[in-house]
Amino acid sequence: MKLLILDAGHCLSLALAREANRRSDVELIIEPRLALTPERLDEVRPDALVIPPLSRPLTADPASVTAHAEAVMACMAACRSRDVPLTWCVSDQLYEDGFESPIDEHVIPEPRDEGLRRLVAAGDRIRAELPRHLIVRLGPLFALEGGHAWLGELLDTLVAGDDLRAESDVIFCPTSADAVAMALIGMLQQQHCGAEAWGSYHLAGTEPVSAYTFVSMVRTQLATRLEGRGETVALGGVKALSHHHDQPLRRVLNCRRVLNVFGVHQKPWRLEVGRMLDAWCLARDDDPAASKEVDQA
């Protein structure tokens, strides 16, 4: 199976490359930008196109959101002209106001934000005009490296001694980019073998948690590992924000369909964070300049 991936520097693109390198049944062609022409599809002849998500579109620059939506539409038109399946990953933030109960796939987002509405309109057109598509809605992605690598950004900020601020009243399911990459390749392999299970799916980590609790847990686990290594680092703190005073905003995706159709189980975000922190610590061993003052006491 040959996949064409856009936006080479995105954390999900890097995760897909790592996953493909562990397998012998997947070939990846990765484009540097979020741009595609029908002629490029003719050259590569992929079995599917994969577009990584625009992370945190609610706080992104409006021009970036518009550009992403327009690029997705151009990709959809190219795929339609060459009958190439399209997989587009989108942020759970499209469900701007959340829901009290877990959100099923058939619930189409109806945001008030103009930028989010552009992304929803792109999804509507894909569903209407390109039968062979996967729209995969993701919880907040985290990874150690690449664009939108939330966990890497948190670690850099904490180690620099700067404080982090996170909402204590926004509940979601953090999602490992590595877990998404493994799931996407498995899903597309089944489609390539004739599953024909096109449509919208939800993919997120297990255990809903507030942004504040997630960031606090990352800080605690980081401090524990650094102490175990004998390193003294004055980590930045974590401060709680509260924007939804009446009740927490819950943005929790119901992921049963991806399990029932493709057999994809959600990975616990705590285990994924722990694994990535272990990898981050090993990388420090290979980079002496990254090590901080060691407590000699």
What do the predicted segments below correspond to?
Residues 6, 52, 86-92, 136-138:
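SDR active-site strand-loop-helix element
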Residues 48, 73-112:
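Conserved Rossmann-fold NAD(P)-dependent oxidoreductase catalytic core, especially the SDR/UDP-sugar
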Residues 65-66, 101-123, 148, 174-175, ...:
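Short-chain dehydrogenase/reductase
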Residues 1-24:
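N-terminal Rossmann NAD(P)H-binding glycine-rich loop of SDR-like oxidoreductase domains
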Residues 31-73, 78-80:
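NAD(P)H-binding glycine-rich loop region in Rossmannoid oxidoreductase-like domains
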